[in-house]
From Swiss-Prot:
<dbReference type="InterPro" id="IPR018336">
    <property type="entry name" value="RNase_PH_CS"/>
</dbReference>
<dbReference type="GO" id="GO:0006364">
    <property type="term" value="P:rRNA processing"/>
</dbReference>
<comment type="function">
    <text>Phosphorolytic 3'-5' exoribonuclease that plays an important role in tRNA 3'-end maturation. Removes nucleotide residues following the 3'-CCA terminus of tRNAs; can also add nucleotides to the ends of RNA molecules by using nucleoside diphosphates as substrates, but this may not be physiologically important. Probably plays a role in initiation of 16S rRNA degradation (leading to ribosome degradation) during starvation.</text>
</comment>
<comment type="similarity">
    <text>Belongs to the RNase PH family.</text>
</comment>
<dbReference type="InterPro" id="IPR050080">
    <property type="entry name" value="RNase_PH"/>
</dbReference>
<feature type="binding site">
    <location>
        <begin position="125"/>
        <end position="127"/>
    </location>
    <ligand>
        <name>phosphate</name>
    </ligand>
</feature>
<comment type="subunit">
    <text>Homohexameric ring arranged as a trimer of dimers.</text>
</comment>
<dbReference type="InterPro" id="IPR027408">
    <property type="entry name" value="PNPase/RNase_PH_dom_sf"/>
</dbReference>
<dbReference type="GO" id="GO:0000175">
    <property type="term" value="F:3'-5'-RNA exonuclease activity"/>
</dbReference>
<keyword id="KW-0819">tRNA processing</keyword>
<dbReference type="GO" id="GO:0016075">
    <property type="term" value="P:rRNA catabolic process"/>
</dbReference>
<keyword id="KW-0548">Nucleotidyltransferase</keyword>
<dbReference type="GO" id="GO:0000049">
    <property type="term" value="F:tRNA binding"/>
</dbReference>
<dbReference type="GO" id="GO:0008033">
    <property type="term" value="P:tRNA processing"/>
</dbReference>
<dbReference type="InterPro" id="IPR002381">
    <property type="entry name" value="RNase_PH_bac-type"/>
</dbReference>
<dbReference type="GO" id="GO:0009022">
    <property type="term" value="F:tRNA nucleotidyltransferase activity"/>
</dbReference>
<dbReference type="Pfam" id="PF01138">
    <property type="entry name" value="RNase_PH"/>
</dbReference>
């Protein structure tokens, strides 16, 4: 199968990450995956939701939205409709869950980190790009707390990233564009850590059921892509990457830092 943009079946779209994109937020990036572009910011708030009060633990939460002309046809802002759509709620909860999975909430203390993801151009994979970019914004925000002396270390247990995979015209493909996703018989979003641990899998048989073999092959394809994405994350965060996951390498400091996936 010849892909629209000429990529191989197991090839990611070009990834560009601009760090510190917003001068006000404690952490921010513009992430570009092909033609999909998302601004991700991390903001620190010195309080927690009511259910976390008195626990000594912090919280990571997310909001997600798309600009009206992020898509080919203008979509009204959801605020004008009075409430977020079901899709928006699903995505922002996914982003929050994915990031909380790698944060030591007890070490964070009773603080909330708000992750805001604003899609400025959508060509497939907006939720996975949001997770990948938000991790970098979150890492920078947490590092600022360390630099201010409010935390002893960055409370991140590992890196985390996400990618889409799917079956289009009988072919298993990595990192689907919008057109590929629209034509997919099966599509999956996979979130994994740099240790190869699975955080979340969202898989749907759009054109009917799919076999366990196809599921496992798609998962392997996603793991291949996420390994490459996390390598890029580590390059972007090269000045603080060795401070992430340090609680897992107290005996042998060479273990996790040298891993790329």
């Amino acid at each position: 199968m010849n892909r629209i943009d000429g990529r191989e079946f197991n090839e990611l779209r070009p990834i560009k990450i601009t760090r510190n994109f917003n001068k006000f937020a404690e952490g921010s990036v513009l992430i570009e995956m092909g033609e999909t572009k998302v601004i991700c910011t991390a903001s620190i708030e010195d309080k927690v939701p009511p259910f976390q009060k008195g626990t000594g633990k912090g919280w990571i939460t997310s909001e997600y939205g798309m600009l009206p002309r992020a898509t080919e046809v203008r979509n009204p802002r959801e605020v004008t409709k009075g409430r977020p759509s079901g899709r928006t709620m699903e995505i922002q909860r996914l982003i929050g869950r994915s990031l909380r999975a790698v944060v030591d909430l007890e070490a964070l203390g009773e603080r909330t980190i708000w992750i805001d993801c604003d899609v400025i151009q959508a060509d497939g994979g907006t939720r996975t790009a949001s997770i990948t970019g938000s991790f970098i914004a979150l890492a920078d925000a947490l590092n600022k707390l360390v630099e201010k002396g409010e935390l002893q270390k960055i409370p991140l247990k590992s890196f985390v990233a996400a990618v889409s995979v799917g079956i289009v015209e009988g072919n298993k493909l990595l990192d689907l564009s919008f057109q590929e996703d629209a034509n997919a018989l099966v599509d999956m979003n996979v979130v994994m850590t740099d240790k190869g641990e699975i955080v979340e899998i969202q898989g749907t048989g759009e054109g009917g059921p799919f076999s366990r073999q196809n599921f496992e092959e798609l998962l392997d394809l996603a793991a291949h892509g996420i390994e490459q994405i996390i390598k890029i994350q580590k390059e972007v965060l090269s000045d603080i990457a060795d401070k992430i996951g340090v609680e897992n390498v107290e005996v042998d400091s060479g273990n996790s830092q040298s891993q790329q996936g």
